[in-house]
């Protein structure tokens, strides 16, 4: 049985509003998250992802409220990430109505938290979000040539991105959300070599993120090994609809819902 490719709009939420910028900078307002979520559900999105881009510093209460209101409106799986540090954070988001929770910086600081979360809530609930970039010139290379970053791609960790995805799978996460910081917001297409490298290293689903700008960008990401494709600005500002992306995947003889 072939599993259908999932098309996932990503909503970056800052203080209760959807925003989008390049590499998380120059953020412009893209609307109300609950309204946008309902629109994408109606358009045929397979899942939704909310990333709380203020969360690593700010208040969590606003996001809990957004999740609760969204979960009342939509009938597709909702993943929420940003500022998720503890088992308690995961519990709070799942109770508010999230179906999955994505973890990023906290896992870099203490990888074992991934095992604790997946054992408590099940692998299917836990997504490891990997913000990866090409290692900059003048810095020690990693085995794959990509490194994990934090702080919206601004801070390199020196951790090899492919090895980190592999470690996440070993620690029990159910999916890898692979975000290319080199491609993020550029609209020049997904990072296909990075997708291929991570696909070869893990057997769990890989969600490709970063770089979608045109309808023809999506099928190559799936052909490179992505199980799902995630995009933000092309959907929020009306460049593409979910239906157009699914049609392009069908045209490439890929299975979609």
From Swiss-Prot:
Entry's Gene Ontology molecular function annotations: imidazoleglycerol-phosphate synthase activity; lyase activity
Subcellular location(s) of the protein: Cytoplasm
Active site, UniProt feature: 12, 131
Gene3D superfamilies hit by this protein: Aldolase class I
GO biological process: L-histidine biosynthetic process
CDD domains in the record: HisF
SUBUNIT field: Heterodimer of HisH and HisF.
Annotated protein name in UniProt: Imidazole glycerol phosphate synthase subunit HisF
Gene: hisF
